[in-house]
A protein has these predicted regions:
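Short beta-strand/loop segment that forms part of the nucleotide-sugar
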Residues: 45-55, 77-79
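A conserved acidic beta->alpha catalytic loop
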Residues: 53-62, 108
Length: 260
């Protein structure tokens, strides 16, 4: 862990966008904003909450419009149709203009207040990923998640214990280089590692679902992650990193910049 003065100096230069994918969550959005406001009152860095409406067909979009009109720290973008969680996350990453990017679901099964402990591990680590402790889910949901995580770790050996945990913060420089593909959201930690980044994993609290129903079933919790894992293995085999050793760029006034 970095020394406190170093961390304080680092955080003084940082800003955070918290991505919140939304798909038919009208029943939980009001309480979610209440919980997020508690975090905004304590966050050590300037923070924007960015809702990504993934083609909701209920009243979610109307609620997001009202929230963002009333609260200056809240923004939203709305996809023209439902594209899935990976696309919603990638759209949020592309839209963010901060140095750090967080992620949380809007179903209030995790609390944004746990983000506060994540900041302790920057800048030493490039991503902090939660691990849901004492999961408050059905037996089928918990077992399918255990199976999927075990198979994924066996096939790609990334060491990420709970890749589906909806509580993460990562440096934007790494998030920007993450490609969009089916199931991308399941491999955020592994994709940071592919870039040479480091991932810290922390236990976080987990709660019963506040309202509504889960958008996943046994098919997309077990079989689809397996298929996506083989897709990730192919991407990993073709992955390339690079570093710029020197650059020369013309400035607007005609000056030049050269450096290493």
């Amino acid at each position: 862990m970095p020394a406190a003065p170093d961390r304080a100096a680092y955080l003084a230069t940082q800003s955070l966008t918290v991505l919140v994918p939304v798909y038919n969550e009208e029943e939980s959005l009001g309480q979610f904003v209440v919980e997020m406001d508690k975090f905004l009152a304590e966050t050590p860095v300037p923070t924007t909450v960015l809702f990504v409406n993934d083609g909701s067909t209920d009243g979610s979009l109307a609620i997001l419009r009202d929230v963002c009109r009333q609260k200056p720290n809240y923004e939203f973008i709305s996809l023209s149709q439902n594209r899935g969680l990976s696309t919603a996350v990638k759209a949020g990453i592309d839209h963010a203009r901060t140095t750090l990017i967080g992620y949380i679901d809007s179903d209030i099964q995790t609390t944004p207040l746990d983000f506060l402990t994540f900041f302790e591990f920057f800048p030493k680590y490039d991503m902090v990923n939660g691990i849901r402790a004492k999961r408050q889910d059905t037996f089928v949901k918990k077992m399918s998640s255990v199976i999927a995580n075990t198979v994924r770790r066996t096939l790609i050996n990334d060491g990420i214990q709970d890749t589906g945990c909806p509580l993460k913060i990562l440096k934007t420089e790494y998030a920007r280089r993450i490609p969009l593909f089916h199931g991308m959201h399941r491999f955020l930690g592994a994709l940071v590692q592919l870039q040479g980044g480091t991932v810290k994993q922390l236990p976080v609290r987990h709660f019963p679902r506040f309202a509504g129903t889960a958008k996943y079933n046994l098919w997309n919790r077990a079989w689809k992650p397996l298929v996506d894992t083989f897709g990730f293995r192919w991407i990993r085999s073709r992955w390339k990193n690079y570093e710029i050793g020197e650059a020369h760029r013309q400035q607007a006034a005609g000056a030049t910049t050269t450096g290493k």
